[in-house]
Amino acid sequence: MTRWLCTLVLCALAGTAAAGNEGHPVTLWRIAGATNSVYLLGSIHLLREQDHPLPGVIDKAYDDADVIVMEIDMDDVDPVYTQAAFNRAGVLQDGTTLQDLMGEEAFTAASEAAAAIDIPLDMLAKSEPWLAAITVELMLLYRIGFDPALGVEMTMTQRAAADGKPIEGLETIDEQLAFLDGLPIDAQREMLLQVLSEGAAMSESIGELIEAWHHGDTATLEDAVLSSAVGLDELNEVLVNSRNRRWAETISTWLDDEQDYLIVVGALHLVGEQGVPALLEKRGFGIHQLSEPASLR
């Protein structure tokens, strides 16, 4: 589960120098429309300084695109509104506590696991379990040097703003939070318990994801996702598969357009039979994975 949530929150990139980026696939696809191209990039939400620059083929896809599309419209994000939205969706307002929602046995297990990785669970007393899980995950990622300000979305947002390229969103922040807040409480408990219990092994788990993402190794990414989501079918359906189907429907309408698009979403959404590339291929669109050295054809 930690690898699954890491993929959702992180999907990190490896490689400390340009030479390390050559001669391998990248988690990037080109779809040939009737009159245009659409690129699908597996998103890296948080990065470290040493993970830059991005592979050259990603830069070329960005340069080729007229429109940048992300899970949410990043150039329209209001930090004050976003914080308020998180508070509305995930902060308990009626006197109920995280301990109440977890139950005595699960909360005891969570407290012991949190203490083992030096996480002060008391500070999350007013959080719903899903928000507590994401908060813990981000705290652990920050500890090992990952930063959303260095991630692909922020990098692309800054470039698009400088270049005057429009950014569009597939969803809104409220929609994304509704997916999480609507999860059954049992699934939320499991999210938090798994993140805490596997937190000590996060560096190794992330290392595997980084290596797979860096080499465009979709088989390994898919295996990590599937093995981590065993027994969490409802969670996977709500947060991944149902969204993939909606996105594939939307993207298919852009494949008869005069504009070229670069679509940046979590790599979790681009692997396997239920991934967006596979869904679009089933609709009859030509699609292929791109590689370094940088070439779009």
Residue ranges and their predicted role:
Residues 4-13:
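Sec-dependent N-terminal signal peptides
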Residues 233-297:
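A cross-kingdom marker for long, charged
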Residues 20, 27-239:
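Structured, acidic catalytic/metal-binding patches in enzyme active sites
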